[in-house]
Amino acid sequence: MKNIEEMPSKSQLVAHRSRGLINTSNTCFMNVILQSLTGCQLFLRVIKNLSDLEDLGKYPTLHSFNQFYTEYFSNPTSNILNNNSNSTTTTSSSSTTATTTSTSNNNKSQTPTSPIQQHHQSQTNGLSNQPSVATQSQQQQQPQPPINPKHFNDLVKSFNSKVSPVPQTTVSPHSMVQVSKKKLKLQLYNNSLPQTICQQDAQEFLVFLLDLIHEEFLTLIKDIDIPKEDDKSTPTSTSIVDDNWEVVGKKGKTAIITNSQQELPKTPISQIFSGVLRSSFNRTGSKESITVEPFYCLHLDIRPEEINSLEDALKFFMKPEIIEGYTCSTKKIEISASKSWSFESLPRILIVHFKRFAFESDTSKKLDKLIRFPTQLSLSTASNHQTQKKYSLFSVVSHHGRGLSQGHYTCDIYQPQQAQWIRYDDSTFTEVKEQDVLNREAYLLLYQLVN
């Protein structure tokens, strides 16, 4: 359970079935994150391996995901898309409107022609490795209804008290553990949002959710691996590493390494989503000072005019920043100093966040700017520039509207088994071309490490 390498092979893909998610009360920010995680094969494998675990109810978020995916992949019937020349399940272009209300589901059965329809019709118990040709009777079946993500009501309330889904008749069998967003260990910057603004931010919710699942896995692992009385080993927990150590780099240059945060323990979540950033601080007459810290989400500034692509944003992020007016603490004189970022280690799933929102007084302003991004991305670490790790895009989350508190989220998810992109807009979804995805004003990008 602790090591993701012990789980089934990556080649054993969980077949993805498209299902819409009902917007219960301005919860489109949650829906796009749930759809994105559903499109993540590594995450699906983790949750799938929890299905036979006893007392899963002790871990509220894991239990909610297990219930959610049981419903999501249940009743393997035909998942038919309307094919009025554009293969869509909705009759309106709601994905481009700035509204937080759910789009009505006006699906009508038509003859399916897309590969994903044949795949959905061939599934058994929600799992399949190869698509098959659908029969005529299967083609005439109605699409599955959208799911009400009621399992996450308590979680949404704990994330933001201003977002309160409509009460459900089903009572949760457990109480949600309250987790303050201020205590998240993996936030690399403080948004400091005014309290009067409704903080319905998909990026914040994703980091909040991953941290919550990570903490529950720590408890689960500790419960499973209870040490014996004579076992003197340290139990699984968040442990403090040495504050500083000195390393010798290229050409004999030395540097002081500092861990700015607590070491992130090994769980399936940290193994999938967590990387490590390296901050290098250089000043005249001193050794290089390096700070390393874990991250779930890479926050990239896109405000400068020269930034028009993901590659531009990454270069700007890693560009050395000259620190003006830096004074030596011992000599009390001004010296040259600079700071730069690089990757110490890269995650299996890379989450990129384009910083589109700025907050002034009690209002949020959005930067509407098209940032190009590739379907294939290559990155390297600070210690190994020669070896490029290759990533493949599988999720694009877009925000529509001028402000964070009044906008709407949609997402595009890639289904590798059918080589098809699907656009989700709450309870509706539609097949889209890759170029349509690349033309989106993306807010979040999710890339998966290849091989």
From Swiss-Prot:
It catalyses: Thiol-dependent hydrolysis of ester, thioester, amide, peptide and isopeptide bonds formed by the C-terminal Gly of ubiquitin (a 76-residue protein attached to proteins as an intracellular targeting signal). GO terms for molecular function: cysteine-type deubiquitinase activity. Residues 19-450 form the USP domain. Disruption phenotype: Null cells differentiate into prestalk cells preferentially. They develop precociously and exhibit abnormal cell-type patterning with an increase in the prestalk domain and reduction in the prespore domain in the slug, and spore domain in a fruiting body. Null cells do not form the normal spherical sori seen in mature wild-type fruiting bodies. Instead, the sori remain elongated, similar to those seen in wild-type fruiting bodies that are not fully mature. The upper and lower cups of the fruiting body, which are derived from prestalk cells and anterior-like cells, are enlarged. The active site is at residues 399, 408. Its EC number is 3.4.19.12. Gene3D superfamilies: Cysteine proteinases (3.90.70.10). Residues 116-135 have a biased composition (Polar residues). It is an enzyme of class 3 (hydrolase). CDD domains: Peptidase_C19 (cd02257). One of its GO terms (biological process) is protein deubiquitination. Residues 83-115 have a biased composition (Low complexity). InterPro entries: Papain-like_cys_pep_sf, Peptidase_C19, Peptidase_C19_UCH, USP_CS, USP_dom. Residues 83-154 are annotated as: Disordered. Interacts with mkkA (via F-box/WD40 domains). Belongs to the peptidase C19 family. PANTHER family: UBIQUITIN CARBOXYL-TERMINAL HYDROLASE, UBIQUITIN CARBOXYL-TERMINAL HYDROLASE 10. Required for proper prespore cell patterning. Plays a role in stabilizing mkkA by preventing it from being targeted for degradation. ubcB and ubpB differentially control ubiquitination/deubiquitination and degradation of mkkA in a cell-type-specific and temporally regulated manner. This is Ubiquitin hydrolase B. It comes from Dictyostelium discoideum (Social amoeba).
